[in-house]
């Protein structure tokens, strides 16, 4: 496996990004060693919060949420998925599969050995993060689920069809502009540049190119069986489950219903519909902080 590593200089002086990098080395099933980056802020003994990003962003998406949750006493951990952010980037599209992403993040999570986690997940952060919950339910105390899903081959929305077509056919993938198109507010040039920073050129974007192809939208997809098995675990997850989908996301709009109906911890919870686009972390970070804080406070889990 050929692995690319974005030069550290690409991350110097990013707007609103004061966080020290942390790195963990994981070993792929094929023997390749991969360096995974994560942010780890707040008190070590704070109630831990795991923030998981998706396509095609990185932990920068949580830059306004991380310090606010840390200020409320939480230990806040935000990893970059392999292929994104400061994490290593396999150079071949064929190196990226759904199951490999789950395995990579599982190895990282086991290495940290955290328990009592509250997960906030959006986009592929949910497709992978919810698989982590199913694999390690004993490590998670509560979930906040936003603009994501755990599909099992039942088709796709028109919004996802449009995104799939765009992602596979655009000659050069404009990462920062893609994020900007998925927000309710206009990002600044400096913010757009920060989303572009992990990708010096197109060779670094194979993970971003491949992600849309990995969503299990057809019954024959290789990961349908694994997601069905994950749902069987999630349907018995005992902790609180709060949905926080946005009203302006054509890809996942309405997706909260399946979580509210199938997960017992969602019953009677203060679910929210937030005003924002697909990347609602950019549009309503304060709301997200309040929601996550309410779920993650130890007294709310007693």
UniProtKB/Swiss-Prot annotation:
What is catalyzed by this enzyme?
Answer: 1-haloalkane + H2O = a halide anion + a primary alcohol + H(+)
Enzyme Commission number(s): 3.8.1.5
Matching Pfam families, A to Z? Abhydrolase_1
Top-level EC class as recorded in UniProt = hydrolase
Q: What GO MF annotations does this protein's record show?
A: epoxide hydrolase activity; haloalkane dehalogenase activity
Q: Does the keyword Endoplasmic reticulum belong to this entry?
A: no
Domain (AB hydrolase-1) spans 48-150
Database matches in SUPFAM superfamilies: alpha/beta-Hydrolases
Q: Would I find Transcription regulation among this entry's keywords?
A: no
Catalytic residues, per the record, are 123 (nucleophile), 249 (proton donor), 278 (proton acceptor)
The record's annotation in PANTHER family points to:
AB HYDROLASE-1 DOMAIN-CONTAINING PROTEIN, HYDROLASE-RELATED
Which NCBIfam families does the entry link to?
PRK00870.1
Family membership: Belongs to the haloalkane dehalogenase family. Type 1 subfamily.
Q: Function of this protein? A: Catalyzes hydrolytic cleavage of carbon-halogen bonds in halogenated aliphatic compounds, leading to the formation of the corresponding primary alcohols, halide ions and protons.
Q: How does it assemble?
A: Monomer.
Protein's name according to its UniProt entry: Haloalkane dehalogenase
Which species does the entry assign this protein to? Caulobacter sp. (strain K31)
